[in-house]
Amino acid sequence: MPARAQVSEAILLAEGQKSAVTEYYLNHGKWPENNDSAGVASASTIKGKYVQSVTVANGVVTAQMKSDGVNKEIKGKKLSLWAKRQDGSVKWFCGQPVKRDNADDPNDAVKDDADANGKISTKHLP
């Protein structure tokens, strides 16, 4: 199966956490620190045929692909969804794995996740 089709599962599973993360932010004024505070299942429970886990960390939702049974170009690699405040609403982004050091960063700053086990090439992102 093409890597792009397998990556779409990761995006779908990660997107499933967006409403909980957004709701937490709107209620608390900061991003949820982890899956539990976001009110979603544990990272290892949010999985699929090709996805090993989906983690919420300081409002960044990161999906990690499995290390076997997936296209070799994406084995064990990650992608992230993250939000920023914009004009009174929350705008979401998707791409390479990132992290946010502080759940209540006033600038919603994110940076490349240097600890990420490889990045999914943009050619595989829908």
What are these regions (language model features)?
Residues 1-22:
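Amphipathic alpha-helical segments typified by the pilin-like N-terminal helix
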Residues 26-126:
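Periplasmic/extracellular, small/polar-rich flexible segments of pilin-like filament-forming proteins
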